[in-house]
Amino acid sequence: MSGTSATLADLVRRPSVNPMGRDLSGPEYLEARVTDYLVQRFTAAGIPWARQSVAPGRDNVVARLEATVPDAPVILWDAHQDTVPAEGMTIEPFSPLVRDGRMYGRGACDVKGGMAAMLVAL
């Protein structure tokens, strides 16, 4: 698996379901697992980061790379960590499945795929 695909699989394996007003009755809820993964990746890459507490188990992570070229334009990359609930999925939502060159799993296209691309690009 390539760097981006492996990173995406790592993210899909980390449930981060937004409860959307529902009772927190399962271990798949909230974004803490993805937050911890992002912190680990940024730390390993030597990228400064900060947590922003929103609610218990629902921290944001902000990382910042300084420009290496004077007066370079600012680029902002943004991705949310939460996914919609997994009810109704016909595959195991948190076990990445590659079929016909595509990865399936909760959040693979919204927005963990984009997040994986950003992480690998760093």
Positions of PLM-derived features:
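Acidic/histidine-rich catalytic neighborhood of metal-dependent amide-processing enzymes
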Residues: 103, 111-122
